[in-house]
From Swiss-Prot:
Chain intervals with Low complexity compositional bias: 24-36, 488-511
Family to which this protein belongs: Belongs to the FAM124 family.
Region (Disordered): 1-37, 286-360, 488-546
InterPro entries membership: FAM124 (IPR029380), FAM124_dom (IPR046365)
Sequence ranges of Polar residues compositional bias: 304-324, 347-360
UniProt name for this protein: Protein FAM124A
Gene assigned in the entry: FAM124A
UniProt biased composition (Basic residues): 286-302
Length: 546
């Protein structure tokens, strides 16, 4: 079969970045992941999406997303659904508005057309709803009539689409639609944040490789819209990127970038899409479970951290990064080519706003260090030794996080920028320890369809995964049951239940580990408003906390 069959036709004819199948010339690099470096391929959560739901709607939306992603892999938490404190009035979008964010799933065609059609039927059931069908004007028409349909979960959330893969791997692709005039600037912007160049690049489309292993690719792409189309930012979704050397990155960004917590910064791209930057804590040491109490006692008598200003980088500067980076000074070698001179000029001319953080006990996040962290500190997507049950147990019991160790994230409202007190923190990060990894009982997959699909088309690929670019055991991540045998008649090795809606505040009088069943206080509409929040007249103001 011609690899472009169903691929959207000529290069400039198709607006949809996902119209090209996984086997087209746009994404042929999905079969050449060995060319990626370890740093580029080792973090599957380099890009994630926060979905912001109205009160009471987070759980069904989270389950709907998990059920769809289970067709790619049942333990791939790339999306976190959180709730607002109160519903908001929706502004009617302009006619023909194009949401700026989309998620495209490429499924293997060789396992049968019925599998793709079955998932397509799932996307036609609530809470999913049909959004639009893309019109293809190229020389080749898609052989599956559903391959140009787009769906959505709720207003202001990303579009979703299903595409067949003629050859290569299954793919999860995040797509940002750009204004025609802003495409080149957006390309440079995301190239700077992702610290890499696109693997495929055309006049109106490019692909950044995010993560790759034996069966799955995670990609980030940009699509240039025609002049007469304008992307609308998804006001109920926020893209989040893990970044390194935040102090070096901030002066290079085109729009203001402000800290909303100790580890997160907020900015916008050229089209007004909100972006969260999560700073990686390189070489962060986590106390052992037996020493948590001792560490907390030590911290009670320690002096608070002084206010730290973003360093003004000048040639020869050796100041340490604000996030305790082990490097003696700014590392410009990691920047994409062409940004070194821009960094030197803008760092000297841009004022550096001071920032400081207070410590609280309301937030815990997954460690975000580099490959030199201890193997028990990060999920392992490359090493796959041992029995599946042993790997799952090892992840649950070995990946314990100390809330006391991660004290100190005074958060601010993502949309308003208003600073919140510790009692107002009501949403756990997309990188928090999911409850399914803390539970010792495994439950079946959300649907029997997903279980049978996994067993039908994954059994032939079981076994240890090869390391990428000779990853050593010390640099590998803590065991995550990535490829485990699933069967429609067995639920012993199925995915654990999805986490509850992230609308709780951790309350504790002494430090506890997240998996040690901390006390949880549910927060509803009676939660006190954050300090300095808007009055009753500002009901449209976003109330989502990261």
């Amino acid at each position: 079969m011609d690899p472009k069959a169903g691929g959207g036709g000529e290069e400039d004819d198709c607006v949809d970045s996902g119209a090209e199948t996984g086997g087209s010339d746009y994404s042929h690099l999905s079969s050449t992941s060995s060319e990626l470096s370890v740093e580029e391929a080792q973090d599957p959560f380099l890009v994630s999406i926060h979905i912001i739901a109205d009160p009471g709607e987070s759980q069904p939306l989270q389950e709907a997303i998990d059920n769809v992603l289970a067709w790619i892999h049942p333990d791939l938490p790339l999306f976190r659904v959180s709730e607002r404190r109160a519903s908001r009035r929706r502004r009617k979008p302009p006619k023909g508005a194009q949401p700026a964010l989309a998620v495209v799933l490429f499924l293997q065609e060789e396992y049968g057309e019925e599998q793709i059609l079955q998932l397509h039927r799932t996307l036609q059931q609530p809470p999913w709803r049909h959004h639009h069908t893309e019109q293809v004007h190229g020389r080749f028409l898609p052989y599956l009539p559903c391959s140009q349909d787009f769906f959505t979960l709720a207003p202001g959330t990303p579009l979703w689409a299903i595409r067949p893969v003629h050859y290569g791997k299954e793919i999860v692709r995040f797509t940002v639609y750009c204004r025609y005039d802003n495409y080149a600037d957006s390309l440079r912007f995301y190239q700077l944040i992702l610290r890499r160049s696109p693997s495929q690049k055309k006049a109106d489309f490019c692909i950044f490789p995010i993560f790759s292993n034996l069966d799955v690719d995670i990609q980030f792409s940009l699509k240039r819209l025609p002049c007469d189309q304008c992307p609308v930012p998804t006001d109920s979704s926020v893209l989040e990127f893990r970044v390194r050397d935040i102090g070096e990155l901030v002066p290079l960004l085109p729009n203001p970038c402000s800290p909303i917590s100790e580890g997160r910064w907020q900015t916008e791209d050229h089209d007004g899409n909100k972006i969260l930057l999560q700073a990686q804590r390189v070489h962060k040491k986590f106390p052992k479970p037996g020493r948590v109490h001792h560490a907390s006692e030590k911290k009670r008598h320690s002096t608070p951290l002084p206010s730290t200003a973003v360093p003004s980088h000048t040639p020869g500067s050796s100041q340490q990064s604000p996030l305790n980076s082990p490097h003696p000074g700014p590392i410009r070698t990691g920047l994409p080519p062409g940004h070194q001179q821009e960094f030197a000029g803008r760092a000297n001319s841009t004022p550096n706003p001071p920032w400081s953080f207070q410590r609280s006990k309301s937030l815990f996040c997954l460690p975000t260090g580099g490959p030199s962290l201890a193997s028990s500190a990060e999920p392992q997507w490359f090493s796959n030794t041992g029995a599946p049950g042993h790997r799952a147990s090892e992840w649950r019991h070995g990946h314990l996080l100390s809330i006391d160790d991660l004290e100190g994230a005074q958060e601010t409202d993502v949309d308003t920028g208003l600073r919140l007190s510790s009692s107002d923190l009501s949403v756990v990060s997309a990188y928090s320890a999911p409850s399914r990894f803390c539970s010792t009982v495994e439950t079946p997959l959300p649907s029997e369809r997903c279980s049978s699909h996994w067993a039908a088309h994954k059994d032939s690929r079981e076994g240890p995964l090869p390391t990428v670019s000779r990853v050593t055991t010390e640099a590998s991540w803590a065991s995550l049951p990535f490829f485990t045998k699933r069967s429609s008649s067995s639920s012993a090795t199925a995915r654990a239940a999805p986490p509850a809606p992230s609308t709780s505040t951790l309350t504790d009088s002494s430090p506890q580990l997240p998996c040690d069943t901390p006390k949880v206080k549910q927060t509803d509409g009676d939660m006190p408003p954050p300090p300095g929040s808007a009055g009753p007249g500002d009901n449209d103001m976003e109330e989502f906390y990261i």
